[in-house]
């Protein structure tokens, strides 16, 4: 039985530790000590060959610099997002510390609460090293169907961008604009993130599969989604600071929105949904912003 170390004991990290424990000997660690089975120190985790890292995107760079020493690990990254300060995708950040052929990225539609209930789930493991993807795929339980892909760019763009669309969808729901408007917003969001993905060499098929459309439809249509709930808060007139405090969890879409806004300005890209979400996070009246977008 393979030993796997999970770094990050939030909802998603804990859910993955639960799922992987069916076939693996799993250990877990986090910044804050937890009263959990198989909770160990980071030093013990880093002695293992297989690592699953579920650290939020905005914390990854500092954590890698301060705590991570590569020791021939095989790494599966289980977070999605773009670093707001640098505009870097997670693969760009991790590849500064881990060889490309030793790292994979997890994507696809997955709520942690449903994984914890062993409900059917499908995920994609993305890596340039197909043998590595196959290794990690073998660790997942029967209720999680895994697929593999080499399109890291597609998985990274889709996984990050869908959180921004989910914020917009939450605003749409909170304003009571109806299901017609929501369907229009989500489908246009899919086109927007696919167009953005081409800038990074992403493949079109990734956006119509689990990593793209699948994850987008899940995240942008349910109050189980943190980013959707951010949108609901904006529709209620709350500031992003108030929303984050009430949420008590990381909503990756906020940092990703700011990153996309900066990238769009730098590269002169037309990203209307990301732009409007940025304006609304900055305090623009959502009644004005979203209605104007939907009518144009």
Swiss-Prot record:
Top-level EC class: oxidoreductase
Example of a GO MF term: NAD binding
Transmembrane feature ranges: none
SUPFAM superfamilies in the record: 6-phosphogluconate dehydrogenase C-terminal domain-like, NAD(P)-binding Rossmann-fold domains
Residues reported to bind NADPH: 12, 31, 80, 112, 226, 250, 252
Binding site for sn-glycerol 3-phosphate: 80, 108, 110, 162, 215, 225-227
Keywords from the UniProt entry: Cytoplasm, Lipid biosynthesis, Lipid metabolism, NAD, NADP, Nucleotide-binding, Oxidoreductase, Phospholipid biosynthesis, Phospholipid metabolism
Disulfide bonds: none
Catalytic function, reaction form: sn-glycerol 3-phosphate + NAD(+) = dihydroxyacetone phosphate + NADH + H(+); sn-glycerol 3-phosphate + NADP(+) = dihydroxyacetone phosphate + NADPH + H(+)
EC id: 1.1.1.94
The keyword Cytoplasm is assigned to this record: yes
PROSITE patterns: NAD_G3PDH (PS00957)
Claim: NAD is one of the keywords in the record: yes
Catalytic residues (UniProt): 162
GO biological process, one term: carbohydrate metabolic process
Superkingdom classification of source: Bacteria
Pathway: Membrane lipid metabolism; glycerophospholipid metabolism
Location (main, coarse): cytoplasm
Pfam families: NAD_Gly3P_dh_C, NAD_Gly3P_dh_N
Function (record text): Catalyzes the reduction of the glycolytic intermediate dihydroxyacetone phosphate (DHAP) to sn-glycerol 3-phosphate (G3P), the key precursor for phospholipid synthesis.
Matching NCBIfam families: PRK00094.1-2 (NF000940), PRK00094.1-4 (NF000942), PRK00094.2-1 (NF000943)
Name this protein carries in UniProt: Glycerol-3-phosphate dehydrogenase [NAD(P)+]
Organism from which the protein derives: Sulfurimonas denitrificans (strain ATCC 33889 / DSM 1251)
Taxonomic path: Bacteria, Pseudomonadati, Campylobacterota, Epsilonproteobacteria, Campylobacterales
């Amino acid at each position: 039985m393979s030993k796997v170390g999970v770094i990050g004991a939030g909802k998603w990290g804990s859910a993955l530790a639960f799922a992987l424990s069916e076939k693996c000997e799993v250990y877990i660690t986090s910044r804050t000590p937890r009263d959990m089975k198989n909770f160990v120190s980071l030093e013990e985790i880093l002695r293992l060959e297989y690592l699953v890292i579920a650290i939020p995107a905005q914390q990854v760079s500092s954590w890698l610099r301060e705590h991570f020493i590569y020791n021939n690990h095989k790494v599966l990254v289980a977070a999605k997002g773009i670093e707001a300060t640098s505009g870097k995708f997670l693969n760009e950040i991790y590849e500064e510390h881990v060889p490309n052929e030793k790292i994979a990225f997890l994507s696809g539609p997955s709520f942690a609460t449903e994984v914890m209930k062993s409900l059917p789930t499908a995920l994609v493991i993305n890596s340039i090293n197909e043998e590595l993807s196959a290794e990690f795929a073998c660790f997942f339980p029967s209720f999680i169907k895994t697929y593999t892909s080499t399109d890291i760019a597609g998985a990274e763009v889709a996984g990050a961008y869908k959180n921004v669309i989910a914020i917009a969808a939450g605003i749409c729901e909170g304003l009571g604009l109806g299901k017609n408007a929501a369907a229009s917003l989500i489908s246009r969001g899919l086109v927007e993130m696919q167009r953005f993905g081409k800038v990074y060499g992403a493949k079109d098929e990734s956006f119509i599969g689990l990593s793209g459309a699948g994850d987008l439809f899940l995240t942008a249509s349910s109050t189980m989604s943190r980013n959707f709930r951010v949108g609901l808060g904006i529709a209620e007139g709350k500031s992003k600071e108030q929303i984050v405090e009430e949420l008590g969890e990381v909503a990756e879409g906020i940092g990703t929105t700011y990153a996309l806004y900066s990238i769009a300005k730098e590269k002169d890209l037309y990203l209307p949904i990301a732009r409007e979400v940025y304006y609304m996070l900055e305090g623009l009246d959502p009644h004005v912003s979203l209605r104007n977008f939907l009518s144009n």
